[in-house]
Curated annotation (Swiss-Prot):
SMART domains, alphabetized: CTNS
Record: glycosylation sites: 52, 174
Transmembrane segments: 14-34, 93-113, 123-143, 148-168, 180-200, 223-243
Name of the molecule in the record: Cystinosin homolog
Function: Thought to transport cystine out of lysosomes.
BP terms from Gene Ontology: L-cystine transport
Gene3D superfamilies: 1.20.1280.290
Coiled coil: none
Predominant localisation class: membrane
Residues covered by the PQ-loop domain: 9-75, 151-213
Membrane topology (UniProt): Multi-pass membrane protein
UniProt-recorded Gene Ontology molecular function terms: L-amino acid transmembrane transporter activity
Record's subcellular location: Lysosome membrane
Length: 270
């Protein structure tokens, strides 16, 4: 297993990593606090929360397994070389566990607070069922040969796919309502900061090791930040340019705005 060549770079790696952890972790709280203060989740898309829970759960499985399992680490070194470093840091593990818990809390708020006519769409439910069904099939494929690195790579790919999909319902809802009221911009600003810090952390490791294998050795982490940053910019454009709050004429507590999920209401499912 490789070790750090530069102590300053190692320290910088840890600092930047925990900045990413703090930014991403704190990003969950503005939405939770907003929901709590309003006693309402009107404006928050339920499909987003449902898909986000699957995304973070799959990311947690990947991080925890690769970080703690000597067997999977050996398979990683056999694949990418024993001079490479494991592309998962302690802050990645801490963040993914925290993310699952906070997303579950947000889901709980949906059940207890005023939510208007919105429901989770059948399409979102279908995506979640298919994804976990696919993961179960992959588990039984990996079991006979103990191909655990391949299996957790599947979970890593799942979280990338879910990252691509999960933002679409919220972006569509903002466009339909011509408003971002009820959707916390604080979440987006912190998520954007975390994405940039995450990339910087990977660059620091690559410079120290004189190798860029950690980018494609953990393609999920690489694509995660890229996709998140893209949608963060889109949401900031919606919030500050297209639909600034001063243009909103209806109070979100009334629940009168359109709250469409990923598909038309005619296809909604309880």
């Amino acid at each position: 297993m490789a070790s750090w060549n530069s102590i300053p770079l190692e320290i910088s790696y840890e600092i930047v990593g925990w900045i990413a952890f703090a930014s991403w972790s704190i990003s969950f709280y503005p939405q939770l606090i907003l929901n709590f203060r309003r006693r309402s989740v009107v404006g928050l898309n339920f499909d987003f929360v449902m898909l986000n829970l699957t995304k973070h759960s799959s990311y947690m499985i990947y991080n925890v397994c690769l970080y703690f399992s000597p067997v999977i680490q050996k398979q990683y070194f056999d694949t990418y070389g024993d001079k490479e470093m494991i592309p998962v840091a302690a802050n990645d593990v801490a963040f993914s566990i925290h993310a699952v818990v906070m997303t579950a809390v947000t889901l709980f708020q949906i059940f207890i607070y005023e939510r208007g006519p919105q429901k989770v769409s059948r399409l979102a439910i279908g995506i979640v069922v298919v994804v976990w069904g696919f993961a179960a099939i992959c588990f039984f494929i990996a079991l006979p040969t103990h191909s655990w690195l391949w299996l957790i790579s599947i979970f890593n790919s799942i979280q990338v796919f879910m990252t691509c999909v999960k933002y679409i319902p919220q972006a569509k809802m903002n466009f339909t309502r011509k408003s971002t009221v009820g959707w916390s911009i604080g979440n987006i600003l912190l998520d954007f900061t975390g994405g940039l810090a995450n990339y910087l952390q990977m660059v620091i490791q690559s410079i120290d090791q004189n190798s860029w294998k950690n980018f494609y050795g953990n393609m999920g982490k690489t694509l995660l930040s890229l996709i998140s940053i893209f949608f963060d910019i889109l949401f900031m454009f919606q919030h500050y340019v297209l639909y600034p709050e001063k243009k909103v004429s209806k109070s979100p507590e009334t629940g009168e705005e359109s709250n469409e999920p990923l598909i038309d209401s005619s296809h909604e499912h309880v």
